[in-house]
UniProtKB/Swiss-Prot annotation:
Keyword annotations from UniProtKB, A to Z: Coiled coil, Metal-binding, Nucleus, Zinc, Zinc-finger
Gene: COL16
An example molecular function term from Gene Ontology annotations: DNA-binding transcription factor activity
Location of the region described as Disordered in the Swiss-Prot/TrEMBL record: 63-105
InterPro entries the UniProt entry points to: CCT_domain, CONSTANS-like_Bbox1, CONSTANS-like_ZF, Znf_B-box
UniProt KW Cytoplasm keyword: no
Organism: Arabidopsis thaliana (Mouse-ear cress)
UniProt protein name: Zinc finger protein CONSTANS-LIKE 16
Zinc fingers (B box-type), renumbered ranges: 17-59
Compartmental location: Nucleus
Amino acid sequence: MMKSLANAVGAKTARACDSCVKRRARWYCAADDAFLCQSCDSLVHSANPLARRHERVRLKTASPAVVKHSNHSSASPPHEVATWHHGFTRKARTPRGSGKKNNSSIFHDLVPDISIEDQTDNYELEEQLICQVPVLDPLVSEQFLNDVVEPKIEFPMIRSGLMIEEEEDNAESCLNGFFPTDMELEEFAADVETLLGRGLDTESYAMEELGLSNSEMFKIEKDEIEEEVEEIKAMSMDIFDDDRKDVDGTVPFELSFDYESSHKTSEEEVMKNVESSGECVVKVKEEEHKNVLMLRLNYDSVISTWGGQGPPWSSGEPPERDMDISGWPAFSMVENGGESTHQKQYVGGCLPSSGFGDGGREARVSRYREKRRTRLFSKKIRYEVRKLNAEKRPRMKGRFVKRASLAAAASPLGVNY
């Protein structure tokens, strides 16, 4: 199908594209030996820099025809047609006005060479610029240095009025756009005037005009101190009024100017209240300690009462009494309000059923640790023994060999000893 399509296209035009076989070939690439249309040529030769360097030839759109000129001599040799141009040109099926001769339109059969100013040279130039080391041109550098204005530090000097005016004009012309304009300065001055509440036309800007003199500062500090004193007095009056309120909620009106004496009396009252409250707390604690009484038994009377009734314990044997760190017994009797109750003191927060008294848990823990220690030790011994046995076993090419087969292989006559 591709061949028939190529033949069909070739019948209408000079040559079909070797890549897409759909359009007329516009370029011939000698490196690829292919006729390509415009789109295929741009696609193929823009893939990489190597493909961009391929030399290509632009094909003609019209079929060449040999034109005879009247002024040509018979001795002049005829034009030679390129070798690659043979074999694919076709004559037109219909006459194209061969009777008319147009001397202005002359078709050259020779394909012109690609000029140096082709588009491929642009790519080469770009690659050279990318990989090229910059060269310092002294002429260009001098011109650049002359164009640049070097900043200079100038010391103030006494100048005349004409020089000052000229410099101001030059500065305005050179630094135009860097400094604020006159309109901006006027707006800024108006804003400052509104902030200060007065004009800036006066010549002196002293501290007195701005309201920051020493006398006024002293007055401000004095006013602040007086306000603080009044607030303290008001607070003290409120405190005394709250303390002197009656049960009905009425507040008696009393005018007192003795601030220090009243302050001292209030402090004394507060200290008295604190001392009285502390004494009450101590008394309550003492009463609580007095209420908690330990039971004191008369051992002689108890022994005489239980003389012939046997042991007082239900099990028949006295229980084991363990003392904790604080020295209190594990079982104690406390009397509260005339009634005696039994309380069980659990030592260290452990229950009696945990076996702490007889060392049950400690014994179990010690047995577990001993068992674990011996198990690890026996495990190490077992692995060491296996390692030694493996090292002593005979090997052949890294593998274990049975001793019988080794002895048979060692004997020259195959006799096992």
